Amino acid sequence: MAIERTLSIIKPDAVAKNVIGQIYARFEGAGLKVVAAKMIHLSRAEAEQFYAVHKERPFFKDLVDFMISGPVMVQALEGESAIVKNRDLMGATDPKKAEKGTIRADFADSIDANAVHGSDAAETAAVEVAFFFPGLNIYSR
């Protein structure tokens, strides 16, 4: 198994619920290390740039509006099969379809306010991590 790095965002709904620590405990319990982290309030331009891949989708405006509605916690996670592990921890995009015990089943309210974002592939993970943590702002251990 390869050591991978992936991006995770704890979205405004989960930050507002004060469950950052509970979500971090799940990352660490699954063997993932937080190698970079910061809390930020995205600007509209930053959210539009980050989610540019969805620009033509009907949900784009609502997604951007939601992501700028409050602070988010952004972290780079590292570990064996980090991308798949993180996606398994998150659960299905729609919390109603997410397996019990996943982050979205436990903390998300709707398909829009779904608590977390995670990279879906190695290529997107590299781009997304670099978006939030350019240069040498990552500390493997």
Curated annotation (Swiss-Prot):
The gene is ndk. GO terms for cellular component: cytoplasm. It holds the Pfam family NDK. This is Nucleoside diphosphate kinase. Major role in the synthesis of nucleoside triphosphates other than ATP. The ATP gamma phosphate is transferred to the NDP beta phosphate via a ping-pong mechanism, using a phosphorylated active-site intermediate. It comes from Ralstonia nicotianae (strain ATCC BAA-1114 / GMI1000) (Ralstonia solanacearum). Its main location: cytoplasm. The keyword Ion transport does not apply. The active site is at H117 (pros-phosphohistidine intermediate). GO terms for biological process: CTP biosynthetic process; GTP biosynthetic process; UTP biosynthetic process. It is found in: Cytoplasm. NCBIfam families: PRK00668.1.
